[in-house]
């Protein structure tokens, strides 16, 4: 099926377990319009990241701490095992990962007019010590030179802002907003068992987010990716069938399915639940 790619998550994680420990700590499953990757640890980051898109987090194993700047204050947002969280766009964040933990992250590709920022702060304050704005194409290639530049800077050596703190005017300001609390995935499913029998249930979406995350129960669904990719994430103890362009593909539980842009398919969930993720620009 040219428009559909399916990967069994448990086997994929087992096959790539060497990438979830230092120094790599992550492995990309899909890397086109949607960046779908899993992250391990330990990995205690010192920098904060700022981007114009939203990020979806799910902790498969163990907890993580997402350091955020919320209304000007640095705080620790804990995402526990089994919890989901949608980070709004333009919120400064710094993921802190621990040993023997694995988490899912989904984000979209950047437009050629969008900029990311890597920012270091003075101690535990919200004062900027060093920042660089850049166009992100490949985090593995683009980020290390900026980190190296910081550690070679006078700002790092003195711990005080200086002439090298800012290299340009900020293209945009960080968002000043209250952040939501993480959602326990299993509790959400249990709380919406009756509702999902009547159709898809919104987990995240408009008007708060551009990203659309939906819960699907048993039944048949005509799905269309549209101009962006669509992710179908089969949950535990779920069996489903996807039909696309005359092909039929039986899906096991805990399978991640990518539907390419402008692709239509029929999803038949015969038992259990699925979560879909779409991230327009």
Swiss-Prot record:
It is found in: Cytoplasm. GO terms for biological process: 'de novo' NAD biosynthetic process from L-tryptophan; anthranilate metabolic process; L-tryptophan catabolic process; quinolinate biosynthetic process; quinolinate metabolic process. One of its GO terms (molecular function) is 3-hydroxyanthranilate 3,4-dioxygenase activity. Residues 1-162 are annotated as: Domain A (catalytic). Gene3D superfamilies: Jelly Rolls (2.60.120.10). Fe cation binds at residues 49, 55, 93. Substrate binds at residues 55, 97, 107. O2 binds at residue 45. Catalyzes the oxidative ring opening of 3-hydroxyanthranilate to 2-amino-3-carboxymuconate semialdehyde, which spontaneously cyclizes to quinolinate. NCBIfam families: anthran_nbaC. This is 3-hydroxyanthranilate 3,4-dioxygenase. It comes from Caenorhabditis briggsae. The lineage of its organism: Eukaryota, Metazoa, Ecdysozoa, Nematoda, Chromadorea. The gene is haao-1.
């Amino acid at each position: 099926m040219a428009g559909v790619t399916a990967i069994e998550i448990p086997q994929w994680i087992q096959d790539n377990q060497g990438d979830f420990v230092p120094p790599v700590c992550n492995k990309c499953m899909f890397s086109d319009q949607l960046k779908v990757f899993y992250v391990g640890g330990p990995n205690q980051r010192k920098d904060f990241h700022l981007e114009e898109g939203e990020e979806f987090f799910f902790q498969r194993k163990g907890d993580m701490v997402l350091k955020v700047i919320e209304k000007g204050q640095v705080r620790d947002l804990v995402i526990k095992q089994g919890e989901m969280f949608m980070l709004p766009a333009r919120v400064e964040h710094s993921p802190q990962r621990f040993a023997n933990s694995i988490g899912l992250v989904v984000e979209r590709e950047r437009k050629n007019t969008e900029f990311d920022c890597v920012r270091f702060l003075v101690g535990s304050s919200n004062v900027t010590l060093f920042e660089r704005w850049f166009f992100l194409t490949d985090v593995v290639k683009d980020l290390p030179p900026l980190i190296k530049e910081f550690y070679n800077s006078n700002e790092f050596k003195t711990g005080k802002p200086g002439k090298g703190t800012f290299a340009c005017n900020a293209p945009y300001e960080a968002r000043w907003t209250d952040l939501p609390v993480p959602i326990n995935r299993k509790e959400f499913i249990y709380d919406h068992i009756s509702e999902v029998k009547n159709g898809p249930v919104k987990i995240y979406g408009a008007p708060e987010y551009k990203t659309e995350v939906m819960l699907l129960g048993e039944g048949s669904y005509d799905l269309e990716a549209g101009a962006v990719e669509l992710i179908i994430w089969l949950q535990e103890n779920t069996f489903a069938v996807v039909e696309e362009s005359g092909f039929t593909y039986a899906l096991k539980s805990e399978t991640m399915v990518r539907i390419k842009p402008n692709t239509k398919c029929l999803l038949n969930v015969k038992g259990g639940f699925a979560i879909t993720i779409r991230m327009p620009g």
